[in-house]
Amino acid sequence: MSEHPQGQKHCSFCGKTQSEVGKLIAGEDAYICNECVDVCLDLVQTSQQVEAGDWASKALPKPHEIRAALDQYVIGQDLAKKTLSVAVYNHYKRLKVGQSGHVSKDVEIAKSNILLIGPTGSGKTLLAQTLARLLDVPFAMADATTLTEAGYVGEDVENIVQKLLQKADYDVEKAQKGIIYIDEIDKITRKSENPSITRDVSGEGVQQALLKMIEGTVASIPPQGGRKHPQQEFIQIDTSNILFICGGAFAGLEKIVQQRQEKGGIGFTADVKNKDETKKLAELFRQVEPTDLVKFGLIPEFIGRLPVIATLEELDEEALMQILTEPKNALTRQYQYLFNMENVDLVFEDSALRAVAKRALERNTGARGLRSILENVLLETMYDLPSRTDVGTVFINEAVINGEAEPVYKSERQPKEAVTHESVAKADLKVIDSKSA
């Protein structure tokens, strides 16, 4: 213990005795006085302010730069990318202005959370993940179908913020600038347009619970790995500056939009439309209005918290082909990297990739289905390769994708210049035309 020769207890940091300070706090082998505690607190707070200032001084990517970064990972969806780029830029510009202290007393910029509407596998989750990675902010994802009102079996809405705090390594300041993506938001719609006497704890009840969280409130989060109980101290997280992005497929919403448009008028000025005419899904989604979402089952207050609506298109065959070959994290590139680790080249014929795209379209799973198709096709090959030393190249053609043939094995590896294809030269992928196999 820290004691003077005379036996008086003293602070291990400044050396002052117990009689010279207001309070002396005992540790296992040392003491610290109240004055040194105050100094330490000031140092910690100053350090946090410097870190916050560092973030505020970082150059914020402009909308064009955000869009360019999204283009590297997400194919198509031009309107959604543009909408997201502007919304995210304005959101973090608002945060920087707030931290710099140059806040206008006359104008208060409200938070613009985002609603993504698009079919399954169109890139909603990937867009949100890419944004978080680009901006270097914590990112957490939640499934709305697992959420229930507090007190019922299921996940509490505050668990979403806890996930974000975990991603930020329990750095509160960092977490409060993060992005939360809530998927399957269309699955928590009201079960009926009419009020019900039975409590809807996983539909409208969850929407009500999310309202304050999305708008901005102080959430009480238990410490690391803990569960809530009355005696513990909670970590306070202000959600006012957390960007919430909600996404969903909203199957059936297009019919509501079309019905509204086909009502027309009365008399000679009526807009007569052929009801058999069906518009493209993307075109209908682009014309979504808040009243359509209310009819779908979202409550007006919830829609009001998501003022920015970005719609995504269904992916066609060409888009799926591009997804297989062009992005930085293209699936073909990922599998070729895995095969290269076994000192084997993986070569896809152009017709094979088109067959993969066609099968994904038939399954109606969008880009999400591409991986499962390739995984099934390459399963036996990936099982055998680590045990073989006589394979240098594996060729995949259309017949292999369709289950009509086995992959072709060759002992020698391919010269790099022989396996590049014009359509994917920029991506540096080993994709060859079916005629040159």
Swiss-Prot record:
One of its GO terms (molecular function) is ATP hydrolysis activity. Component of the ClpX-ClpP complex. Forms a hexameric ring that, in the presence of ATP, binds to fourteen ClpP subunits assembled into a disk-like structure with a central cavity, resembling the structure of eukaryotic proteasomes. Residues 1-52 form the ClpX-type ZB domain. ATP-dependent specificity component of the Clp protease. It directs the protease to specific substrates. Can perform chaperone functions in the absence of ClpP. Belongs to the ClpX chaperone family. InterPro entries: AAA+_ATPase (IPR003593), ATP-dep_Clp_protease_ClpX (IPR050052), ATPase_AAA_core (IPR003959), Clp_ATPase_C (IPR019489), Clp_protease_ATP-bd_su_ClpX (IPR004487), ClpX_bact (IPR046425), P-loop_NTPase (IPR027417), Znf_CppX_C4 (IPR010603). This is ATP-dependent Clp protease ATP-binding subunit ClpX. Keywords: ATP-binding, Chaperone, Metal-binding, Nucleotide-binding, Zinc. One of its GO terms (biological process) is proteolysis involved in protein catabolic process. Zn(2+) binds at residues 11, 14, 33, 36. The lineage of its organism: Bacteria, Pseudomonadati, Pseudomonadota, Gammaproteobacteria, Moraxellales. GO terms for cellular component: HslUV protease complex. The keyword Transport does not apply. ATP binds at residues 119-126. PANTHER family: ATP-DEPENDENT CLP PROTEASE ATP-BINDING SUBUNIT CLPX-LIKE, MITOCHONDRIAL (PTHR48102:SF7), ATP-DEPENDENT CLP PROTEASE ATP-BINDING SUBUNIT CLPX-LIKE, MITOCHONDRIAL-RELATED (PTHR48102).
